[in-house]
Each structure stands twice: as C-alpha cells, then as structure tokens.
A protein has these predicted regions:
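Single-pass alpha-helical transmembrane signal-anchor segments
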Residues: 53-68
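Hydrophobic alpha-helical transmembrane segments
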Residues: 44-56
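N-terminal membrane-targeting/pre-transmembrane regions
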Residues: 1-47, 127, 155
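Transmembrane-cytosolic junction motif
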Residues: 64-79, 90
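A membrane-cytosol interface segment of integral membrane proteins
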Residues: 2-3, 7, 122-168
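Juxtamembrane/interfacial segments around transmembrane helices
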Residues: 48, 72-74, 78, 101-112, ...
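A short, polar/proline- and glycine-enriched secondary-structure boundary/capping micro-motif
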Residues: 16-19, 92-95, 149, 157-161
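Non-transmembrane, membrane-adjacent beta-strand/coil modules in membrane-associated proteins
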Residues: 13, 83-144
Length: 168
C-alpha cells in the first residue's frame, strides 16, 4: 500500500539570468550559422569550420533542452520525504521518518553554503535546490545532512506540523 501524499512541489530553474546566458550563447551560434553558412562570410577573425559551427549550435540547443528538463520534485508522505531531481534521479529517493532525527525549515545562502544551485555539497552535507533561499533541512540518524530547497515553505511547514515531524 502506498503512503498517503500530503504535500507535493515541483520546481524548475526559472532564474532570468540563467536563461539570459543560455539565450545569449544560443544567439551567438544562430548568428554564426546565418553569417557563415547562409551568408558565406566567415564568422569572426579565426572562423570555425561549417561542420564545427553546426555541431556547436546543436550542442548549445541540447544544453538548453537539458536545462529545461531539470526538475526537483519533493513530496511529503505519511511515511517520509520523497525527492526526485530529474534527470539525475529517475526514481524518488525515499527518506523514511525513522531515518530522520531532525527536520526543520530554514533560510540558507545557496552560493555561500553550497556553492550554488543544483545537486550540491559532499557526503555529509548535501543540498538539492533550483531557486530561492528557503529549504527543508533534514538531519539523519547517522548525522548526515540534506537540505531540500522549497518555494512553498509555509505550506511545507504546516504539513510537517500536522504530521508532528517539525523539530525546530
């Protein structure tokens, strides 16, 4: 029998500056295609081959598609916390309540504490985040830590309080 779903959140990279950089990079290679391949004028002082431009343009577009596909799914269920960071985790990682010694929401500094967003940190102190500065801090019975970013801290806090699992 599947545990009851009490809270669910899906997050994607939506920061304007990330998409601005990706758009700028893609634009450069689209311009290169038009200038060199269609216009016949070499692009730049030391132009890349036509095949090189096509391959690079395809790779930058694939990077854009990949960035768009990244998604952090968080679920709070009656038996624990489930997290999937697609496409890195294809299935939910399950953290059962009996494995968690502390569970609380906190404000954090993504760049200072973890070096940015994504799958961050090392073995004993990890973070899964895509935006913002609010997160669910889990401390496990083996003293390892996991911070899961959230854009719904109030709703998450209420769910954890209703379950009696909020520790701080």
């Amino acid at each position: 029998m599947e545990a009851q779903l009490l809270f669910s959140e899906k997050q994607k990279f939506t920061q304007w500056w990330i998409w601005g950089i990706i758009l700028l990079i893609n634009s450069i290679w689209i311009v290169a295609i038009f200038v060199q391949l269609i216009g016949g004028t070499p692009f730049g002082n030391n132009p890349m081959s036509d095949v090189g431009i096509i391959i690079t343009a395809i790779l930058t577009i694939l990077l854009s598609v990949f960035m768009r596909s990244i998604r952090l799914d968080t679920q709070i269920r009656s038996d624990g916390i489930y997290v999937k960071f697609f496409p890195f985790y294809l299935k939910f990682k399950k953290y059962f309540w009996y494995e968690i010694s502390a569970c609380y929401l906190r404000e954090y500094k993504p760049i200072k504490e973890y070096g940015g967003w994504g799958i961050r940190g090392f073995l004993k102190n990890r973070a899964l985040n895509v935006s913002g500065n609010q997160g669910l801090q889990l401390i496990f019975t083996d003293n390892k830590k996991l911070l899961i970013g959230t854009n719904k801290p109030d709703e998450m806090k209420q769910t954890l309080m209703n379950l009696g699992k909020l520790t701080e």
